[in-house]
Amino acid sequence: MSLNTSTHIENIKKFALNIRKNILEMSVSAGASSAHFGGALSITEIVSILFAYQMKIDKKNPNWEDRDRFILSKGHACLAYYAALCEIGYIPKEELKTFEKNNSNLLGHPVINKKLGIDFSNGSLGMGLSLGIGVAISAKKKKKNFNVYVIVGDGE
């Protein structure tokens, strides 16, 4: 999808601003020692473009078989991921306040939850790229036509 119009650019800026606000709100709610908001803020624009314009997803059906897949290898940046999922309607805004709380679906690293649009768990840093390659190979063998997007950290 083309992002060359001023309307698209403004929409991306608004999407990214909302993600930043949600990142900060979740960080405050969880407590400073629990949230890695710096890493989350560092991927805000990438996540905004992917979820707002690039990825082929169905907001009403997070389990759509032909949806694009997203893997966050640097799982500690999950605040941006959760905020993006909130912006597209997969995670209710109120649920963001439960980040890192007891019985929350929103932990310090993503944990698979198809209802919330989280396809893959993450914990061991550095596993995302190999997982993404495996998902892409599997899709090709099954003759599926979806993309796999992986965000890795600088230490991977």
Where are these regions (language model features)?
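Cofactor-binding active-site loop characterized by glycine-rich and histidine/acidic residues
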Residues: 31, 41-156
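N-terminal hydrophobic or amphipathic helices/low-complexity stretches enriched
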Residues: 1-19
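Short hydrophobic/aromatic-rich motifs at helix boundaries and adjacent loops
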Residues: 15-20, 104-108
